[in-house]
Amino acid sequence: MLWDKLNAVEKKERTDQQILWEEDLLTSGIERYWKDWSRAKDEGKPEQLLLESAVIHLTPYYQQWIDKVCEGSKNPEWLPPLLSIGAAKMADITIRAVIELFLTRSCFTSIDYVHGVPLSAPSAQSISKLISDNVISIVNYQRAKKTFKDDWLRQSKFIKNWTPKRCRAFTKKMGKIHKYTPKQKEDFGHNMLRIALSSDIIQGKVVWLGRNRKSLLISFSPDVLKELGKRHEALETGSMVYRPMLCPPVPHEKNKDGGFLSPWIRKRMIKRYHPIGCDPRDYNSKPSDTVLDGLNAMMMTEWAVNKDVYKVMSTMFFNDYRIANLPAHTFKDFAFSRSFPDEGTKLEKAKWMSESTEAWGEWYKEEQARSRMLVRLSLARKMMEYDFFYMPYTLDFRGRAYTVCELLSCQGIDFDRALIHFAEPIPQTERGLRWLKIHTANLFDQDKLTYDERVKWVDDNMDMIKAIVEDPYRNREWVSDAKKKNPSFQRLAACFELCRTDGMTQLPIQKDGANNGVQHWAAIMRDKKLAKLTNVLPSSSPQDLYQYVADKTYDIMNQNTADSDWYPRFLDHWVEELPRKVAKRSTMCDSYGLTFYGIQKYVKEEGHVDWVAKEERGGAIVELSRALQDGLRGVMEKPNLGKDYLREVARLISATNKPLIWETDSGFVVQHVYNQIIERISYAELFNKQQLVFSTLSPDLDGDAQFLAISPNFIHSWDAAHMFMTISLMLLEGIRSFSFVHDSYGTYGPYIDTMDRLLRETFVQIHQSNPLEKFKSYLEKKYEINLPEIPNRDEDFDITEVLRSEYFFG
């Protein structure tokens, strides 16, 4: 380790710098939190919880006042319309007014328990005015909307978000603004406020402002402020932008979170949300020594910025190359400057609105990507001042590992993966070079060739690769035009590594499971056909499950052209075969319990029917999704039996309001707990009826969520176990550098043969006995119950064959 080569003074300097970084991280995160909070105080989580309890508490009192007013015979005619908003909204609007005018950050740090109401508190008059203004605006808007419904519906085609400003403009345009005198507003607002003052939520204090002048100041009670302050304090660190570490992270322990040096900014080792009032220990998954050792080993991996890639990436970004998915650095060409067609037809105006919305939507996405790239490159520049850095990790409740910072992480996107490599160069070997060539060919979309063919492809293209390294700006063969999972800069990093002349290597070589979720299901159900298609069983060349499903889907469409008007159109568009990319995402996710909605979502997101006119695209998405679902159903028959079994067990256990718990072979105990969510729709729907929903967790389990989530979570827990069991054996072999992303394993090229052997051995270890049987036995023993028998499987299946499968992880 490079850390061990530092002297005591150098170690202290880096540790001190890390402490300063963490203090700055905390300070800037807190400032960012309060800045965001101040933009919409009433939408803060603590304030939402306050509103929830306040509305429940105050609504009966407002209703009592409404009933009393309605019983009277001398009520002014202007009052009844204002009462139409209802008691709950009255309570909500009143408390929101106090939040808006009273709450500041300093309120939570200087609570005066002696005098109660600070002199900086707003007056009852100002709060009353805000209450009445809001209620009147809402009532006027609702009247206008009801009276001019056709106009409102027509404008809604162009206005996606009816903001308060637009609502007021609509009301004014329709001429439905009812005027109220200052006295009427004051009377109404003061009545609303007096009811709230009768509770222990807010309080008032009379202060003298001078000669014969006094004012009633309004604030929340000290106890309410104290509770709000506690909740804000717990949320402040959530706005921190984490970064890598300059010194080794603090190791995780079974009962102690590790990672950053400062305990108050560490993320929980296993993140889990717990119902209010419940003991978190009853809901936490539990790591084993094997998992902890692996997690800490990943954190101890030393990384460095790849300076060659950084130079190219930053040059291209700041010079607006806008290739390889790089966002624009400047936005001079992004303004939607075409003027609105005032004299055009309704169709032309609607088209302009649609194009304008789409253009500015793309601008917003680009602006986000631009901001993120600026942060990424700034962080890379900072880390380049140091020879190496570390990345803390945490776990989810299934045992999967995640970096705390996506930027400059092996779990990040192409930019981040390409910008880093292992910090310490080691001597390259003949086998390491072979794996580097295979890795390079994979990145250049040659991963369906045999290994020898991939090596040959690289050898045949070495002149191109050398030209790329010499001038990557002009020679752009490394640039991909893919919108998603674009590998361009990883290609560039591989080219730089291939052309090294110092005999050393630093680039992580990745080996990806061939649809790892399906690989696990093929082994669990002993499905020979599926095992062959996912390279669990040996073959002379890599098999392609995605293309197989695509071919099945194509055959279904070809054989059933009379069943759908869309099938002939699909066959005309994809003349010879359905591209594998159309089936890839759905096939990849099927092992995790894919729904028909999920298939439609992926078809739409990945643009597989973008060639269809917009007005027809919805139908195309549905029909292509149906065909894909039928294609998958014929391939995944046996895994579907396993998923059905898991869901049946989830249904039975959830009926007893007990969590699903199982232990994987890594020793990790999974607590599969989805609690019912208690939601409250905000009564401040105000103008546009947009629902502001906030929630708390109930101690009761959500049976539907338990049912739906068990299939993906079960498989994810076992792929996590596979990863940590592999890392455990690699540590015994002396390997200390890991670039692992769930089912993509990476290390130095010279160590790949060892890693390849070990990941197969651990897969055999897991599947020698049936994970479904282990799941069943654990639950039966824990709850002293008898569960249904697991589905039958083909026992004439030798799982040790995977040891000979060359393309199991390719």
Each model region followed by its residue ranges:
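Non-catalytic nucleic-acid-binding interfaces of large nucleic-acid enzymes and RNP effectors
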Residues: M1-T587, G593-N713, A720, M725, ...
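Conserved short loop/turn motifs at secondary-structure junctions
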Residues: T587-C589, E605, H742-Y748
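Ordered, soluble secondary-structure elements with a strong preference for glycine-centered loop motifs
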Residues: S717, G749
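Short glycine/threonine-rich loop-to-helix capping motif typified by GTGT followed
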Residues: P750-M755
